[in-house]
Regions:
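PP2C/PPM-type serine/threonine phosphatase catalytic domain
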Residues: 2-185
């Protein structure tokens, strides 16, 4: 199984010289296990000057917590070992490879069958933000205002794009948690 349209790469010029990073995860009200996994480094990771990752295991599927942890740890390893120099190529390659590896891992055991996760990967290289996202985890930039950078890969986002519902209706829509792309799954 290959990802279709695996990434959305965006250039966001004018990043501040000084970045502040904060990561907070929360198990939420409906789950007993936190399926979020976060990694960030403000120093070099492989050929990238910095790296930011967020993965959220797919709730309702097996081993979502394992899928998010495995995805982030494997992604970091792939970036560290990459011989590529272009940041977009490095990120694209890591997304493709981590998807393949997670699918292989899922095939090893019934306990992992169907496991998957969302992923946001970002780096600031030459003062330009490069972002890849799969699923409905989001990247925001905080400045004078909060700006959502990524576009959700979800059924309700597609419905908004086609004019079937408006943005406000997505909040309580019965299909709001159906994603159209994932790592693994």
């Amino acid at each position: 199984k290959e990802l279709y349209g695996i990434t959305t790469i965006m250039n966001y010029s004018g990043m501040e010289e000084m970045m502040k990073v904060q990561a907070v995860t929360d198990v939420g009200r409906e789950r007993s296990v936190n399926q979020d996994y976060v990694y960030y480094s403000l120093t070099e990771t492989g050929s990238l000057p910095n790296l930011f990752l967020v993965a959220d295991g797919m709730g309702g599927h097996k081993a979502g917590d394992m899928a998010s942890r495995y995805t982030v740890e494997t992604f970091v390893s792939l970036v560290q070992d990459s011989t590529l120099k272009d940041p977009v190529s490095i990120i694209n390659n890591a997304v493709t490879q981590v998807n393949r590896r997670l699918l292989q891992k899922a095939a090893e055991s019934e306990d992992y069958e169907g496991m998957g996760t969302t992923l946001v990967a970002a780096t600031v290289y030459d003062n330009i933000l490069r972002v890849a996202n799969v699923g409905d985890s989001r990247l925001y930039i905080l400045g004078n205002e909060i700006t959502q950078i990524t576009r959700d890969h979800s059924l309700v986002e597609e419905m908004v794009s086609m004019g079937e519902i408006n943005r406000e209706q997505t909040r309580n829509h019965e299909k709001k948690n159906i994603i159209t792309r994932a790592i693994g799954g």
